[in-house]
Amino acid sequence: MIDEIQLEAEEHMTASVEHTREQLLTIRTGRANPAMFNGLVAEYYGVPTPITQMATISVPEPRMLLIKPYEQSVMNEIENAIRNSDLGVNPTNDGQVLRVTIPQLTEERRRDMVKMAKSKGEDGKIAIRNIRRRAMEQLKKLQKDGDAGEDEVIAAEKEMEKITSGYIEQVDKLVANKEEELMEV
């Protein structure tokens, strides 16, 4: 039973680290990255639809993205969604494709992006700590119900702390890498 609790907690922590990694990918750096459009939606026949499902996004140059909609009729919706987002980019429409040139980030904008990355990292660490807390509560309940001895629960709690520290360290590394990437000129 203790092993099941630890295994479940680890699965949830792994998912939290992955979610944090995906969140960090959406933060714009000075380079073109199709992942920056993850989570961006546009109207598609009245239904909010992710842009990544409405068009192919390619990177022909290090600082340019090419967005080719599957249907020309949604070109303006995609263009407006990008323009109205907080990404700080301005697409140009040539009738066939949207070209998005990624401007160099100013020092101030880089600092803002680093703050955003740290915030997303902190959210990930909070999620991991909440998972640990729930697992600890389950362990205490096992002890209270008499399904596990005190020594077993104490050992499991120590192991849970080690596991949690490892996952928090992973999130810290992700944030540090993103920060380094952002501050690189």
Curated annotation (Swiss-Prot):
Transmembrane stretches, start-end: none
Listed CDD domains: RRF (cd00520)
Localization: Cytoplasm
Superkingdom per UniProt: Bacteria
Pfam family, one: RRF
UniProt-recorded Gene Ontology molecular function terms: ribosomal large subunit binding
Keyword Phosphoprotein applies: no
A Gene Ontology biological process term: translational termination
Alphabetic keyword roster: Cytoplasm, Protein biosynthesis
Main subcellular localisation: cytoplasm
InterPro entries per the UniProt record, alphabetical: Ribosome_recyc_fac, Ribosome_recyc_fac_dom, RRF_sf
GO cellular component terms, semicolon-separated: cytoplasm
Job description of the protein: Responsible for the release of ribosomes from messenger RNA at the termination of protein biosynthesis. May increase the efficiency of translation by recycling ribosomes from one round of translation to another.
Family: Belongs to the RRF family.
PANTHER family listed in its UniProt record: MITOCHONDRIAL RIBOSOME RECYCLING FACTOR PSEUDO 1, RIBOSOME RECYCLING FACTOR
Protein name: Ribosome-recycling factor
Gene: frr
